Amino acid sequence: MSPAPAATQAPVSVSLFDLSTDAPVLQGLRLVSHFPEEALAQSLQTSCPGSEEQISPERRPFQGALDISEKLFCSTCDQVFQNHQEQREHYKLDWHRFNLKQRLKDKPLLSALDFEKQSSTGDLSSISGSEDSDSDSEEDLQILDEERADLEKPTRPQGFHPHRVLFQNAQGQFLYAYRCVLGPRHASASTYCVVPLEESELLLQNLQTGGPRDCVVLMAAAGHFAGAIFQGREVLTHKTFHRYTVRAKRGTAQGLRDARGAAAHSAGASLRRYNEAALYKEVRDLLAGPAWAKALEEAGTILLRAPRSGRSLFFGGREAPLRRGDPRLWDIPLATRRPTFQELQRVVHKLTTLHIHGEDPRETSRLDLPQTHRKRVRERKVIEEESKVPSDENEALGQNKEAPTQGSESEGGDGSQVELELVEVTLGTLDLREFDVFPKQRRRKRNKRERKQDLESGAQMTLSQQPKEDEALSGSAPLRPPLDEATSPCQSELWDVLLAACRAGDVGMLKDRLTASPLHPGVLPLLSAPLGSGGFTLLHAAAAAGRGSVVRLLLEAGADPTVQDSRARPPYTVAADRSTRNEFRRFMEKNPDAYDYSKAQVPGPLTAEMEARQATRRREQKAARRHREEQQRKQQEQEKQEQEEQQRFAALSDREKRALAAERRLAAQLGALNPQTPDPAITVSNIPRCWSCGMSLQGLVPFHYLDFSFCSTRCLRDHRCQAGKPSS
């Protein structure tokens, strides 16, 4: 066995923008990533050992530049044609197909006359005959075609990357750089042919100058667009667009589905089509702008990444921003993610990175990945043996028919019976999960009415009316304040009395009880004691019931507004109305340091000046609302009066309308002589109106014919039709 190759050193990565012209790495560069014809032929010979003796002169690789022949000639059948149609018809003949097989098998070719003679005598197997012969011949042709493709295709050596260029410097180091950042492509350049001398010098010059100075990068995919203009490493400008054009759970754009003839007519499909058109317009307007158009014209390198279906964004239509065949235009030779500005920066950084190897990377790849040579040989004997398998199996099955009887006789002779028991075993794999999976439970949202009922039930909760669930949660302990002082029967009675007074708003009884607090030490602890498992205090009950005076009295007596119930709610948040909440704010203004009001969730103090301003603002709002309502009422009356006058005028005859018009003209003349304040009723009745519908013509340009005036052409046409005159 050959010893394993030594581990190669990892290549060093250097940015092209960090290299200067006099860098040691760039001294004595020469281009080594081209393939002469001799190297190509040698690679073909070494790819298949022993193939030199098998390959006929006709199948040897063509020496010279590869191009498409324009001659009307078939090299297989040695036939000359008059036109392309005759040449295409020849390729469909059995004679041409037979000669192709003969050529692939290295057998002599037949002329047209010999082929007709042998086919008429039956010496040749029919190319399109029975199914067996046809399938065999087609399989042979396919296998030989694969062998020919393996032998004749220009296999490139290991370690060669078509999008990169390999250089070697004076120190013997190998430099790998991406071709797209080393200037425009040459017209006669080819991937596997010799690089022209002019392009070789251009590549060396661009590498030594530090890569592209002006570069435009454009990416578009799935409704996303990203573009940037780079000057060296610096970003001059960039722009991104995003439109919803991809169909849900499909990953394809809407336009691609429409192009297949399955256009959807839903609202979502229409929205996606609109977004496609909007994205097309936005990108075209951006690239047609002065800054981007100038950058595309002066850039030395243009990098593009777009799917085949989305390239019309850059090449289609009139005044396309990019031109096909532009030598500066390159496809991005990297796998890219979603088009974003960060992805553009990553692509430019990746493409402008120079990889420096200590050894030839092609040799390293060849040693690391040895080539495996495969031979595809079809043997008729193997097929014949496989065809005999069914008959052999039938014979074996016939011989085995007696086996069960013999086995049963032997078992009967031995007297031993074998019992088989079928056991079903269930294997659980839930314990192998990394995380526990629980079904997601949806919380039902309660409406305002349910929340209000909860507050009322909390306010009316007493010790004797606690639900049975509270008994289960609190154990066997009675629903009493968790205080030692409240264990006596007198304390329980006092608690019930205070709670009933808070709910009913009995301020007098509370004053009598609270004024005796210095004499009765059991009253003061009950003010802030929670009520059972619900956690309601006396202050909670009074606030939920909307008793503002009771809340003020309890706060002045020493009730703590920071005590929370079982749902972590202070008394301020359960207040029934604004007036009750204002009592907490007034107490905060008088006693700012008494409690932690942030814990009590009281927003701020309420001073007398603030209340005065609020009262003034409410009065102004009320006056404005009354004035607005009065204006609306007057407007409605005017509209009603105008509608009645319009209906009355429309019901008049033409004679009466002429009389009213004469009176209106006379009144206008008298008003000009004696100007007075007009009466609103007279003004409404004497204003000019449409002769057909009676609509007021004030502020409108009327339509006239003869002595009649109309508000619209429709009324004019209706009046003419009624008068029996033509409308033209």
Swiss-Prot record:
Residues 120-140, 359-416, 442-487, 589-656 are annotated as: Disordered. This is tRNA endonuclease ANKZF1. Its EC number is 3.1.-.-. Residues 608-659 form a coiled coil. Residues 120-130 have a biased composition (Low complexity). Belongs to the ANKZF1/VMS1 family. A zinc finger (C2H2-type) spans 72-96. It comes from Bos taurus (Bovine). The gene is ANKZF1. ANK repeats lie at residues 493-526, 534-563.
